[in-house]
Amino acid sequence: MKPSATSSDLATGPQARAVWPLSEPALTYFPDVRFATSDRDLTAGAAPTPQSAAMVDDQPHVPVLLDRCVELLAPALTREGATLVDATLGAGGHSERFLTDFPGLRLIGLDRDPDALRIAGERLAPFADRITLVRTRYDGIADAVRDAAGGSVDAILFDLGVSSMQLDRVERGFSYSTDAPLDMRMDSGADLTAAQVLNSYDERALARVLREYGEEKFAGRIAAFIVRRRAVTPFTTTGELVELLYDAIPAPARRTGGHPAKRTFQALRIEVNAELESLRSAIPAALQALRPHGRLAVMAYQSLEDRIVKTAFAAATASRTPPGLPVELPGHGPEFVALTRGAERADAEEIERNPRSAPVRLRAVEKVGGE
């Protein structure tokens, strides 16, 4: 039999400041880059309390599964000059921990959001001589690794979804709990906004987005309501959309399954930012960028993301021997081994301390050595 590879055993073992805005993609070196805390989350819109952007900058965000991420990636980072890619930098909470724990580590931090790069740059200023920050979507990882590390690295971390920093900034329009412009762009310089999707997509396209990206069973009904409403007045704010969703979704369904806007907001955000398209390209590129014994860890927060990661990891850990042969051919074994048994979740203690960790699903693999 040719098994997929799983192993729990392997789990042990000239300075210049960038001028904003950057063009995308752009590779920029930040010589002096500090802030405070961070985290990334995909609770699709429920912001705890309204607050200004300034308040958000001062409010701590707790990195999800921080200790476990360090535990999983540490064996790949022990050599002097090892390189880690934080493919979803956010405010830099995970990166700060790795840079602190591994004094010889070099970091490449990726984010499409210029605000995130600014905040992370300030936070990581004490490590300025060891970091490279790159403004790009995470599917730009291959170019970033080629330009900053010669094409291969020792470990990569993805923390998918919208970041807490983005979610808590009311003016970004990610939250359905407060009225704000219908924006939802992770990169404020991008062209497409949620308002444009709502006001320009035809009814069939809207239903597809809601069904595929929000798994919304009332997708067709909601799309019809949107088209009728925008014929009178175009959508401009999140509050207008939430009000429509209360009208479009039948009352019995509104009483179960969470906030009635949750799935629609998730779907619009994914469409605006091409999140799943980017992820489908990013995971194979990340696997390809690892050196032998390099490790990749991915945190997903909803089933659509996790399904993509699970499928890619299953293929990577499968035998390369042609089907039908009774034994594995030499040199045709799996290219990667799994470091987690399925998807790991946050424990009750972490969820109590950081409720936004509740939906996380963590998967990790290691590249087999000797190639």
From Swiss-Prot:
Give the chief site where it resides.
cytoplasm
Gene Ontology MF term list: rRNA (cytosine-N4-)-methyltransferase activity
Location comes to: Cytoplasm
Q: What processes in GO biological process is this protein linked to?
A: rRNA base methylation
Q: Does the keyword rRNA processing apply?
A: yes
Q: What UniProt keywords are attached to this protein's entry? A: Cytoplasm, Methyltransferase, rRNA processing, S-adenosyl-L-methionine, Transferase
Q: Where does S-adenosyl-L-methionine bind?
A: 92-94, 111, 138, 159, 166
Superkingdom of the source species: Bacteria
Q: Does the keyword Iron-sulfur apply?
A: no
Q: Which EC numbers does the record give?
A: 2.1.1.199
Q: Which Pfam families match?
A: Methyltransf_5
What GO cellular-component annotations does this UniProt entry give?
cytoplasm
Q: Which reaction does it catalyse?
A: cytidine(1402) in 16S rRNA + S-adenosyl-L-methionine = N(4)-methylcytidine(1402) in 16S rRNA + S-adenosyl-L-homocysteine + H(+)
InterPro entries linked to this entry: RsmH, SAM-dep_MeTrfase_MraW_recog, SAM-dependent_MTases_sf
PANTHER family (UniProt xref): 12S RRNA N4-METHYLCYTIDINE METHYLTRANSFERASE, S-ADENOSYL-METHYLTRANSFERASE MRAW
Recorded family membership = Belongs to the methyltransferase superfamily. RsmH family.
Q: What does this protein do?
A: Specifically methylates the N4 position of cytidine in position 1402 (C1402) of 16S rRNA.
Please identify the protein, giving its name as recorded. Answer: Ribosomal RNA small subunit methyltransferase H
Query: Which gene is the coding source of this polypeptide chain?
Result: rsmH
